[in-house]
From Swiss-Prot:
Record InterPro entries: AB_hydrolase_1, AB_hydrolase_fold
Name of a matching Pfam family: Abhydrolase_1
Superkingdom of origin organism: Eukaryota
Upper classification of the organism: Eukaryota, Fungi, Dikarya, Ascomycota, Saccharomycotina
Keyword Transferase in annotation: yes
Subcellular location, principal: mitochondrion
Protein name as annotated: Ethanol acetyltransferase 1
Keyword Hydrolase attached: yes
Catalytic activity: ethanol + acetyl-CoA = ethyl acetate + CoA; acetyl-CoA + H2O = acetate + CoA + H(+); ethyl acetate + H2O = ethanol + acetate + H(+)
GO molecular function: acetyl-CoA hydrolase activity; carboxylic ester hydrolase activity; transferase activity
PANTHER family, sorted: PROTEIN ABHD11 (PTHR46118:SF4)
Subcellular location, record wording: Mitochondrion
Key words, A-Z: Hydrolase, Mitochondrion, Transferase
Free-text function comment from the UniProt entry: Alcohol acetyltransferase that catalyzes the synthesis of ethyl acetate from ethanol and acetyl-CoA. Can also function as a thioesterase by hydrolyzing acetyl-CoA in the absence of ethanol, as well as esterase hydrolyzing ethyl acetate.
Amino acid sequence: MFKPTRVLKSSQPILNSLPHAETVKMAYDLHLPKKTLHQNMNITSDEPIVFVHGIFGSKKSYATDSKLIANGTHSPVYTIDLRNHGETGHAQPFNYDTLVQDIKEFCSTHNLSNIKLVGYSLGAKVSMLAALRLPELVKSAVIIDNAPIKQPYIESYMKQYIKSMLHVDDAKISTTDKDWKRKASEAMKRYMPNATVRKNLLVNLVNKKPEGFESPAIDFENGNIQFLNPIKHMEEMAVKDVSDWPVESTEGLKFDGPVKFIRGLKSPFISPEGFKKINEHFPKNEFYDVNSAHDILDQRPSEYVKVICDFFNLQRYNSAPAHTVLGHKAPEMRV
């Protein structure tokens, strides 16, 4: 078993162990397109997009971008909170197989089919595995800067993220402090000097409990701001799982649908080994290179949104029968 480092010992004890759950009910936001292909027709896609965030992200991380994607593709976009993130419940385990089962259950609950996945970082691996395991559900995907391989080198980054978040916990910043967000960011600087990373980690920080949200890992009654992640559990539960990949169980699996990979040229996440495995698992892949590090969504927001919209629109156009109106099988006239 992995031993936590000394720095990770917070002044507050872990409240309770997390429950074990095969699937969880995922919180989500639905972004509907405001524009149509023709002003007199209600034309939308019957192929919904599911946007899967990165580690310590949430459905709110790139809500603005998701609205742009909805309008740009004329498609509903579901942004989800993975387990142990945002307003979705806390549970173990936190491995890729389990996260894919959560995606499957989510789609079943909301009657989604022919889904198009957009996954970033952690979400990219979840999306790749979902495509390989659930080809009957997934039509196509955009994978942002990750590869289907084990990546043990990212464990050190994960530990730094957790250290910085625990430092906020130890700072005991009051929920009534009007400057709580800035003070939290300052508290994180010791272990996380990168302001962009801090901003993304802070998306899960709240000064009041979300309505209906319960967790055995968070004490909302202590008067302090709280992360919506069970951060005191995350090193033992998540560090090695996030860097992992189910090599043996995916051996020989291929996804025959179109997949667009957006690669950061300054990022180490898609190595030569990763490139090889991408070609093995996703034979219909295309690459788009961005002059960016791993944080493509922050460094090149307009560019990556355009790539997603262009890719999905082209795929929809290519698959549409010649006699149908692009966008929906039966467009309804507005009255």
